[in-house]
Amino acid sequence: MSESKNIPLVQVLANALMKSSFDPKLEAWVNDLHEKISSFMQANPNLLSDLRHFLDDFKNLPARQKEVWSKAASLGWYMNFESSISMKHYVGLGQQALNSYMEKEIQADWITLTTSIIAAYPARAEILTCAFELHNEGRYIASIPLFFAQADGICDQNLDAHLFADGEKRKLAIVERSRNAEPFTDVLLELLQIKTPFNARISKYEAKDKLRAPNRNCILHGSCNHLDYGTEINSLKAFSLLAFVVLVFSKESLIQ
């Protein structure tokens, strides 16, 4: 390897510039710039390596984010219009920490979220308003089934496949939509296909299962093993699913 190939890029550029004809002021500026760049590179020897790692991380961001959101869903929570990056931190802390965080976040953003949902689907306004009022009144036994029903219907309205049924049809529709989806929208769409406590079989009624999320099948089929579902946190979890479904189809390219 020739010696010139070992010369830093900044030095090569500086040498090339210095061989050109400049007036004294421009030459002084070039010298000053060279010194500053050299000093900066000496002070940050790992800059290029760090930049390369950053670009690699950015490239893998959708896959990593999907992993976080999938984990959150397995614990009964979905992101929404107002979710912050802090959600990732609490997902890592586990069920109890995520419950406390999401409960506070959704309650703080309740008016904004409910208003956005109704604005997105005005034809459903009467039903949605009723569901939100039932939740506000503490009538969670009634609000939860309505949240599930509207999430199911909104999914069908957009994909021509229900959220809690039509598994193969929904899968094919998601694959087709993902081809022309905006960045990250394909990741959100794929989350509609994963297995969660929300869409688990009726046989999943043990205490550990019910702590994660309300089981839609148990609730709507009146399972005697899930008669204790009517809690505030379960209603908030069902609402988070509804808000997420609305978010997924909020892009103009996806709304039919």
Task: Tell where the protein language model's regions lie, with residue ranges.
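Helix-loop junctions and short alpha-helical segments
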Residues: 72-133, 147, 159-180
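Internal, Lys/Arg-enriched amphipathic helical interaction segments that engage polyanionic partners
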Residues: 19-114
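Charge-enriched, short contiguous segments at helix-coil
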Residues: 199-256
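Solenoid-repeat scaffolds in large eukaryotic assemblies
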Residues: 142-144
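Intrinsically disordered, low-structural-confidence terminal and linker regions
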Residues: 1-28
